[in-house]
């Protein structure tokens, strides 16, 4: 335990890394933005518009996916935003909570894993420690080969358009449509709760949700190319978008973009008169609380990676073990994938 916490590869060490800390700051700013958009009426306005526009179950499911695709910056930010917006919309079309959870979760993570401007891109690229290739560059090159994420998104479209359900999901959907029971299980989260949090003052609009998200994405992209030397006249990537993007410091850039996006959201809602200063300050601790789970998951993942790499030297062991394997080493990726698939079935 002492080694995991205080060693050169322990929790303290990974949290002291500027890139990792940048991702954590980014997650906190996203949590604050979600709470601000809820308090400012952005979720309420978009849900109101969607309720008037969406007329069928298929359209409600596809809109859930589309909104999830548009909010690709972080999977938890995606889940919190899309869940708050689409819950009442899907409820009006008798779509079960289990189906809504599937639509949101099956969109959030895959989209983040194929979006270069996301917290996942920053985290995954950080695992690449090589002078031969940049982490972001490798992340971008693997996108066409990320079949799981791409096929998951295709699967959502097929299931929604063809109205196909099977297994436990079929039971949940049958109960929702025939028995008017959206939950099926004894746990009934959000039952009886107000659909949305109303803005403190004034009437909200769809822009109250879309504008902060668009600004966040834009400032994150600008921050990424800035950190890569796009605006530096002495850099070899001066005015080279692709080169600067590949050479960017993703953790620091996303933290900067998140802070600017959060600041814009606060000022925007102040000028709109949607929330007061006191209300906006309440979003700081509430937003942080919403992001505790992903922060802990990332921290433990970084620690495990550091421990296996520098404490157990697993990479060196695998390299030496495969040195004499000859052509059999080409099967190593398949063996790793098979191991990942079978581990969850072991009790």
Predicted regions and their residues:
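Juxtamembrane/transmembrane-helix interface segments of polytopic membrane transporters
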Residues: 122-130, 224-227, 231, 305-310
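Hydrophobic mid-bilayer segments of alpha-helices in multi-pass membrane transport proteins
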Residues: 1-7, 23-32, 149-154, 208-218, ...
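Hydrophobic packing and interface segments
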Residues: 143-150, 190-194, 200-213, 217-221, ...
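Long, contiguous bundles of hydrophobic transmembrane helices that form the permeation core
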Residues: 152-247, 259, 263-283
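Interfacial loop-to-helix junctions that mark the boundaries of transmembrane helices
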Residues: 12-21, 139-143, 240-257, 323-327
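Membrane-interfacial helical/loop segments at transmembrane boundaries in membrane proteins
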Residues: 129-136, 232-242, 316-321
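Membrane-embedded alpha-helical segments and adjacent helix-loop junctions characteristic
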Residues: 5-101, 272-347
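Membrane-core helix-loop-helix motifs of multi-pass transport proteins
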Residues: 91-181, 196-208
């Amino acid at each position: 335990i002492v080694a995991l916490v205080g060693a050169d590869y322990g929790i303290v060490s990974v949290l002291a890394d500027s890139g990792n800390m940048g991702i954590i700051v980014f997650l906190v700013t996203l949590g604050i933005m979600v709470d601000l958009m809820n308090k400012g009426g952005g979720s309420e306005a978009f849900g109101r518009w969607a309720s008037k526009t969406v007329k069928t179950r298929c359209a409600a499911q596809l809109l859930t996916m589309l909104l999830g695709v548009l909010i690709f910056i972080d999977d938890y930010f995606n889940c919190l935003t899309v869940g708050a917006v689409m819950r009442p919309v899907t409820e009006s079309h008798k779509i079960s909570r289990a189906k809504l959870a599937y639509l949101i979760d099956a969109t959030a993570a895959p989209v983040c894993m194929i979006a270069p401007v996301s917290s996942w891109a920053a985290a995954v690229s950080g695992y690449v420690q090589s002078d031969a290739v940049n982490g972001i560059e490798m992340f971008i090159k693997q996108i066409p080969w990320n079949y799981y994420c791409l096929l998951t998104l295709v699967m959502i479209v097929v299931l929604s358009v063809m109205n196909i359900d099977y297994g436990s999901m079929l039971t949940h959907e049958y109960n929702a449509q025939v028995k008017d029971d959206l939950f099926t299980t004894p746990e009934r989260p959000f039952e009886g709760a107000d659909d949305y949090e109303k803005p403190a003052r004034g009437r909200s609009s769809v822009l109250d949700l879309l504008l902060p998200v668009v600004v966040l994405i834009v400032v994150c992209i600008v921050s990424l190319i800035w950190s890569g030397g796009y605006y530096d006249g002495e850099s070899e990537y001066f005015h080279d978008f692709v080169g600067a993007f590949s050479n960017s410091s993703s953790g620091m850039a996303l933290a900067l973009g998140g802070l600017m996006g959060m600041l814009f959201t606060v000022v925007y809602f102040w000028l709109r008169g949607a929330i007061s200063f006191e209300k906006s300050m309440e979003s700081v601790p509430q937003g942080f609380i919403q992001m505790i789970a992903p922060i802990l998951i990332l921290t433990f993942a970084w620690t495990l990676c550091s421990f296996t790499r520098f404490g157990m030297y697993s990479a060196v062991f695998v390299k030496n073990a495969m040195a004499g394997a000859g052509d059999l080493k080409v099967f190593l990726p398949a063996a790793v994938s098979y191991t990942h698939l079978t581990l969850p079935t072991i009790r």
